[in-house]
From Swiss-Prot:
This is Large ribosomal subunit protein bL27. One of its GO terms (biological process) is translation. It comes from Anaplasma phagocytophilum (strain HZ). GO terms for molecular function: structural constituent of ribosome. It comes from the Bacteria. Residues 1-13 have a biased composition (Polar residues). Coiled coil: none annotated. Residues 1-20 are annotated as: Disordered. Pfam families: Ribosomal_L27. Belongs to the bacterial ribosomal protein bL27 family. PANTHER family: LARGE RIBOSOMAL SUBUNIT PROTEIN BL27M (PTHR15893:SF0), RIBOSOMAL PROTEIN L27 (PTHR15893). One of its GO terms (cellular component) is cytosolic large ribosomal subunit. Keywords: Ribonucleoprotein, Ribosomal protein.
Amino acid sequence: MATKKSGGSSCNGRDSRGRRLGVKKFGSELVIPGNIIIRQRGTKYHPGKNVGIGRDHTIFSKIAGVVSFRRKAEGRVFVDVLPESVSASLS
């Protein structure tokens, strides 16, 4: 017979890793086609000009240019990619 009782097993002690969501390219950053701009759950940010939205609501660039964020009157935030020639004339 053992003189020491065995320790019990625990049901706790595990957790899942974070999902690495959020803005990956900020306003006025240069992007190329296919660059991920935002990873999100749901449409916190909406796709604007020259960007696409993936099946998991990831917003990505369709053209080379500069990232721009704009807010509409109803409160929605849209993400655009402006061509470099247009963004140069704005600044």
